[in-house]
Regions:
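Conserved class I S-adenosyl-L-methionine
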Residues: 9-51, 65-69, 87, 142-172, 199, ...
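A short acidic, Gly/Pro-enriched loop at the edge of an enzyme's catalytic core
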Residues: 102-114
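Conserved Class I S-adenosyl-L-methionine
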Residues: 192-232
Length: 232
């Protein structure tokens, strides 16, 4: 039996997440700007769908690092959606939409691919998120997403940043096990093609100040999950 968070808690979570990103936006560049993001982006690009001539959604686009990649991939149209306007205003080259990833403001079956980087844990309901993604995908359309691994969060890792005032802030993040995500995809009519797990000190091994101690402490812990799925 699964316990589901109450609606009031989920609304509070979404509000807290939005406030965190509004604080983060002024210091959040539209690039993979840390070792984790660089490892994640390399792995995402290795399973990148062919979007040439297609219509693609960059879901929860942030400041637009994947929108930039998509625009260089010769997609016919790139649509970037995010709920944080200060983040969205940094996106270049894409059609920008400010909205919720839980209720996508698009007609059904209009995208050839949906890309989402490190954002699934901000979904207040994973089944609804997968259902909305599947709805806007065309038949045989591709979903490619990454997120922070549930094992990393359970091991004690947090998602945090330093704002303009050099104050460390934590970003709220839901924990969705892979099995939970698999169930949600199956219910939405999405078939998994690829699953990747990036582990501390193995796939994620770029040196940075203090990295030796970090990798020793967390060695082998999965820190990023990457999934590619196809709409049936």
């Amino acid at each position: 039996m699964r316990a589901y968070p109450c609606r009031r808690f989920l609304m509070s979570l979404a509000s807290s997440t939005l406030k965190a990103y509004e604080r983060w936006a002024p210091v959040y560049p539209p690039t993979a700007h840390n070792p984790l993001m660089r490892a994640e982006q390399r792995s995402m690009l290795e399973v990148w769908p062919n979007v040439e001539g297609g219509r693609v959604l960059d879901l929860a686009c942030g400041s637009g690092r994947y929108s930039h990649v998509l625009c260089k991939s010769n997609a016919a149209q790139v649509v970037a959606l995010d709920f944080c306007l200060p983040m969205l205003t940094q996106v270049a080259g894409a059609s920008r939409v400010c909205g919720s990833m839980m209720q996508l403001p698009f007609q059904s079956g209009v995208f050839d691919a949906v890309i989402s980087g490190l954002a699934v844990g901000h979904a207040t309901d994973i089944r609804q998120w997968m259902s909305e993604v599947a709805r806007v995908l065309r038949p045989a359309g591709i979903l490619l997403y990454s997120d922070f691994h549930s094992e990393a969060i359970r091991a004690g890792m947090t998602r945090s940043f330093k704002d303009e005032d050099d104050v460390t802030r934590t970003v709220p993040h839901q924990v969705y096990d892979l099995s939970c995500q698999q169930d949600a995809m199956a219910a939405a009519g999405l078939t998994i093609e690829t699953v990747r797990e990036l582990r501390m000190g193995i796939e994620l091994n770029e040196a940075f100040p203090g990295s030796e101690g970090v990798y020793r402490k967390w060695y082998g812990v999965p820190v990023v999950l990457i999934v590619r799925a196809r709409k049936e």
